[in-house]
Amino acid sequence: MMENRNNNNNRDKNPVKRFNKISIGLASPESILAESRGEVLKPETINYRTHKPERDGLFCERIFGPVKDFECACGKYKRIRYKGIVCDRCGVEVTEKKVRRDRVGHINLVVPIAHIWYFRSLPNKIGYILGLPSKKLDMIIYYERYVVIQAGIAQNAEGESIKRLDFLTEEEYLNILDTLPADNQYLDDFDPNKFVAKMGAECIMDLLARINLDELSYDLRHKANNETSKQRKTEALKRLQVVESFRESNKNRENRPEWMIMKVVPVIPPELRPLVPLDGGRFATSDLNDLYRRVIIRNNRLKRLMEIKAPEVILRNEKRMLQESVDSLFDNTRKASAVKTESNRPLKSLSDSLKGKQGRFRQNLLGKRVDYSARSVIVVGPELRLFECGIPKDMAAELYKPFVIRKLIERGIVKTVKSAKKIIDKKEPVVWDILENVIKGHPILLNRAPTLHRLGIQAFQPKLIEGKAIQLHPLVCTAFNADFDGDQMAVHLPLGPEAILEAQLLMLASHNILNPANGAPVTVPSQDMVLGLYYMTKERLTTEGHIILGQDLVFYSAEETNIALNEGRVELNARVKIRAKDFNEEGELVYKIIQTTAGRVLFNEVVPEAAGYINDVLTKKNLRDIIGKILAVTDVPTTAAFLDNIKDMGYKFAFKGGLSFSLGDIRIPEQKTQLIADARAQVEGISGNYNMGLITNNERYNQVIDIWTSANAQLTELAMKNIREDQQGFNSVYMMLDSGARGSKEQIRQLTGMRGLMAKPKKSTAGGGEIIENPILSNFKEGLSILEYFISTHGARKGLADTALKTADAGYLTRRLHDVSQDVIVNIEDCGTLRGVEVSALKKNEEIVESLGERILGRVVLQDVVNPLTNDILVHAGEQITEAIMKVIENSPVEKVEVRSPLVCEATKGICAKCYGRNLATGKMTQRGEAVGVIAAQSIGEPGTQLTLRTFHVGGVAGGISEESNILAKFAGRLEIEDLKTVKGEDGEGNLVDIVISRSTEMKLIDQKTGILLATNNIPYGSSIYVNDAQVVEKGDVICKWDPYNGVIVSEFTGKIAYEDLEQGQSFMVEIDEQTGFQEKVISEGRNKKLIPTLLVYGKNDELIRSYNLPVGAHLMVNDGEKIKAGKILVKIPRRSSKTGDITGGLPRITELLEARNPSNPAVVSEIDGVVSFGKIKRGNREIVIESKFGEIKKYLVKLSSQILVQENDFVRAGVPLSDGAITPDDILRIQGPAAVQQYLVNEIQEVYRLQGVKINDKHFEVVIRQMMRKVRVQDPGDTLFLEDQLIHTKDFIVENDKLYGMKVVEDSGDSSNLKAGQIITPRELRDENSLLKRTDKNLVIARDVITATATPVLQGITRASLQTKSFISAASFQETTKVLNEAAVAGKIDYLEGLKENVIVGHRIPAGTGMREYDHTIVGSKEEYNDLMVAKEEFNY
């Protein structure tokens, strides 16, 4: 064998092993020895004088290989010709030094040692298998107690027989030995009479070796099924899980519990724990060497002590120290007393080198540094084409060096590589010629960190430029999120022909015009370009003071207009007419006379004809739509050329227009002083009301905030109007704002109006951001006073602090999203599911937020969509909804469409193309191999960072609009009001009105002619209603009004008030207002939890008519004994003043939703439809009883401090909250089912992004939520092998149940010898067996039908879902590395390398796109090679 190995050339020595799965398991002592190259006997590393490795030490050359290439330790054999020879003097094999990176040694331990992972981490594997608690296990392992392994005939001091697993002190152990017969210790260990007790890991090894897993599994299953106590049942199930893991793992490979105890410790290769000489004769060493040294020193000392037969006490102490040193070698963080260096830093153990960002997985396997790369500062390249970038010459010469060298040799300019390098380094002119040729058709990749989505790396065709900076095309800046204030970019060079092809066809910048997150163009002109285009297409008319040349001229063609412009006969912004091609009603391109401006004529010269004549002012939003439209009607090259043209045009006209602004362009409205004076007067009026005690302090505060908010809004409107009308809208500031080039309404407001209300500094991040009620009245043009400036600084600094903190959060969110959805790949065309998701327009407060068309565009419909009026089929089942179909559906009365969705896709691996629908980056149907999971994660995560960075744009100014306090009819129509109960009462002005006292009043507004539902609203409890059921209303009529600042409780009856449990100082406090001296009674949470503050209403005959429970914080408006009329407000409950919302609230909200966390004070939700009644109070909770029509009763406990939203005798539906607070996703899943919770999550997350103006397509969230819901929890395992409460993949669950379908379970095997009770057989086998028994008159087999398992769907957070993927490699590289690996090893898991991450880690191509496994056998070649093969095929007929 040895000779053979020497003769083969180097390449065959390590052939690339092809593998398609990886399994993991516990290493047996034999397998460690088989891998090892020798035993490390000495703790020495290298000799301090010769600096050579010590023999048999931790760096020994005989074990690990030579330190120098092809040179043995003593120097007898040098050079490559002796390769493979083992030196007879020093025993070192002559080979390359790199073998020191992969040769492993070992240490033979004198006593077995328990592996820390299996007794210190939870769940405690050894403890669960033996059924011992962790504390007791530690007592055994660290040599504190003896444990009985086999009791034999032993008895304790009282003469009782002892049991297995009894713990004995040393004294008890010795006493028992004294009482035993002398020959007992000479019996065989497995003789039932022998008494065996041991301590330490060898005792555990013995116990584990004696365990019969099958029997233990049977016992535990029996226990789990028949145990009455909940605790013992869960205990049995937990143990069963570990036992089943071992049993399962033995199917694939041998995996024995006693291997959790080690007899041999492997020593990792020395190059992976190097010893580096520093200057000054000292050495820097890896921590692992210290840890190994401690193990070897203690092991050798123990060996010596045993040889000299030292006393037991000393041995035991040494064994315990050895156990501790092996513990810290494997995992130094788990121990209370970690081994530390002199500088008090814990040493890095083997586990630490796997964990975390600096660990093996994330540092070296998932992210590697690459060759052929460069980086430099970027500058703008306005004359580049969209697919080009400028690369400095020197950088290119270095990057393309090998290609240049090859050409130099080919041309015969040089003979050797070395001389070619010299020529390149000298930068001789011939090099540049060759370089120009080499880079043709050889693109490079540009990457800007942070790469948040796939547009962060794009391919460009390089152009050689002078200088040292990379030139970047201005239109791709948006995608890279780059600007030119010193950003740097990295350059990478694709080397192989396949890589070059992929870069050119898939990654070229001109192919990435659309954003994968929402399908809108991402290469959109911004800033100067938009401003220039806006300016050139804006219309200006002649006024007295300003005459526009050439107004209303008529031109025959664009050429004519051009001539007139150049000759100065017509101005750019003049209104003119022109004969040009545009679409008519039928959608055909024809010549017509169009009224337009000279600038627009110029612009339309570069617009492709297929797009018609664009006659609009170009704002950023318009441009985005135009680019999208042009891409849809033409192709990528046309669009790319168009983009380049408008880029040049934009810059040209921004320069020609000279658009900049001065202080004079910022116009402050004259009415400002008057507005502020009015607002101040109103505030004073409110303070007066407050001083007289008419309103509470909270109401006063809320109203003041409202007044200033609306004053500010009015002022902003005035300022905008001013600036809009200045110079016909040619005010530079207004143009920048209106075109979308820079600035926002908010910023204009702060420059010209007033800065407005500011948020109060928070003490903690969790605290509320209240609003300071005195606004900043100055604006930046006038300048701020010292106090105003001081208040402002808080907001500005908060913005910067938030940015720094939140970027990390957003990055972590992206990482979790990637991990959970990385293995979702489009694997098949159609999964054939019959399920879908019903989509309708998304409304908020009756405003349509997202129309039906927008939501279904690019989806595949599940069933035919039919127009309800005409019964025409608008789109057939299985068709994609294109823009054209979308318009048809929008114009029809269809309100709901059922579409395919990733949420319901039934593909076994990944997802199918039909359920996913359109690929947003191309606008066509998704192809197989598309990594949609990663794209979803990027699309959701990328704006996360943007959002976090967006808080500071308006330095802490409190946004918010005045609270709404009424409902107006949005359309004319007929009202239908359901569940309306009212009483007569007085409103704030003392007029008689109807007051609503029902909680679930709903109004529907119906079109009188068609009967179509136009709008629905809930009418709030306590509001004054001005209409009746079936009344016809006009648009704008007031339907109802309410107090926006307070929730109220209104009396339904006339009568007399009595207080119950209302004791001052206990259940309510009297708050005396310092300024007014007015007293208010406010309900507070007292110490006495039994008190339930209640108002009782008594009728005429002193009978109790009604009682009202009062929530904490309610203000009482009536006194004890007061006589009241129906409709009287009894209690006001102040609504919490509006907090300032920024995405700081947004990012944690998204995290909360995606992690499926339950909110801190969740609402109590009804699980059934029924009628409400109130029960007793238990431990500070009020009991709410709901009884359904069918007599089912459910009881709920609601905290007294939370507000109850239902009243006695209300009818509630399942899923309706009974108390205030957020509804938990778990409740929705439990009560309304998986579809409801999926919709809830999608809509809630979208809501957060929508507030920030970020558009993300629903399907990305659906992909992630699909991954969160891929598990079910077993409720009843039936006859399957599942365990109760076990989490399993839905697919596996269905497969197992399907296997059992139609089978039988033997209950009584009768006289059959083949079947046992509990066995699962087919009906056929049962029939055959029984017919055999019948013939011989024996007892027949009795069997019953199989009981299949039942399970409920589970919603897991993205972190949990990532850690529970099928792939242990992916999970380990995510979080909790040691825990994942230790569970995988026990279960002997197999990773089939199906996701992207695990393939990156093992160095395979990812199974997506061109790396899909079915293309593995495809050979890529040239056309000629193919033709040659074809000819051969015909000739030889194969």
Swiss-Prot record:
GO terms for molecular function: DNA binding; DNA-directed RNA polymerase activity; magnesium ion binding; zinc ion binding. SUPFAM superfamilies: beta and beta-prime subunits of DNA dependent RNA-polymerase (SSF64484). Binds 1 Mg(2+) ion per subunit. Zn(2+) 2 binds at C831, C905, C912, C915. InterPro entries: DNA-dir_RpoC_beta_prime, DNA-dir_RpoC_beta_prime_bact, RNA_pol_asu, RNA_pol_N, RNA_pol_Rpb1_1, RNA_pol_Rpb1_3, RNA_pol_Rpb1_3_sf, RNA_pol_Rpb1_4. Zn(2+) 1 binds at C72, C74, C87, C90. Mg(2+) binds at D483, D485, D487. It comes from the Bacteria. Its EC number is 2.7.7.6. Its cofactor is Mg(2+); Zn(2+). It catalyses: RNA(n) + a ribonucleoside 5'-triphosphate = RNA(n+1) + diphosphate. The RNAP catalytic core consists of 2 alpha, 1 beta, 1 beta' and 1 omega subunit. When a sigma factor is associated with the core the holoenzyme is formed, which can initiate transcription. DNA-dependent RNA polymerase catalyzes the transcription of DNA into RNA using the four ribonucleoside triphosphates as substrates. This is DNA-directed RNA polymerase subunit beta'. It comes from Flavobacterium psychrophilum (strain ATCC 49511 / DSM 21280 / CIP 103535 / JIP02/86).
